[in-house]
């Protein structure tokens, strides 16, 4: 089966390179589109700053996430169609992107650390509700 648009759920971690490499290995032979989705870090989870500082911190973290996605795409040696930075429930965003952008394969990491354990839970939700194929990739780095 050939896919036409692959959505890769990544995090601002080195393991994301493995996920994108898997996507590129599937996409390149059939010239499929590859897009990336990640969760925005919420500074409220990590800090107890005053409200005005939170907005500044959110902006900085959003910019760092954008820079990471850009760098990830550059290192992939394959064009990235779109990037999405989601907040809230990742699985809902993945399902919405699949519908709106005609994604036919979602790739998620299977990992036990913070983001990826949340993404893995999201992957279970995506698998149960998805109308498209979902590939769970085992990640090194424990």
Swiss-Prot record:
GO terms for biological process: response to stress. It comes from the Bacteria. It is found in: Cytoplasm. GO terms for cellular component: cytoplasm. Gene3D superfamilies: HUPs. The keyword Transferase does not apply. The keyword Cytoplasm applies. Signal peptide: none annotated. Keywords: Cytoplasm. InterPro entries: Rossmann-like_a/b/a_fold, Universal_stress_UspA, UspA. It holds the Pfam family Usp. Required for resistance to DNA-damaging agents. Belongs to the universal stress protein A family. This is Universal stress protein C. It comes from Salmonella typhimurium (strain LT2 / SGSC1412 / ATCC 700720).
């Amino acid at each position: 089966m050939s896919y036409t648009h692959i959505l890769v759920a990544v995090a601002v971690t080195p393991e994301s390179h493995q996920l994108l490499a898997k996507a590129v290995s599937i996409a390149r032979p059939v010239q499929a589109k590859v897009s990336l989705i990640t969760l925005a870090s919420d500074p409220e989870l990590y800090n107890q700053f005053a409200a005005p500082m939170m907005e500044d911190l959110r902006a900085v973290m959003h910019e760092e996430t954008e820079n990471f996605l850009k760098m990830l795409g550059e290192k992939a040696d394959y064009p990235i169609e779109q990037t999405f930075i989601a907040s809230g429930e990742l699985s809902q965003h993945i399902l919405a992107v699949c519908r709106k952008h005609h994604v036919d394969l979602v790739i998620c990491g299977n990992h036990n650390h913070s983001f990826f354990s949340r993404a893995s839970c999201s992957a279970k939700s995506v698998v149960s509700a998805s109308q498209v194929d979902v590939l769970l990739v085992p990640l090194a780095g424990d």
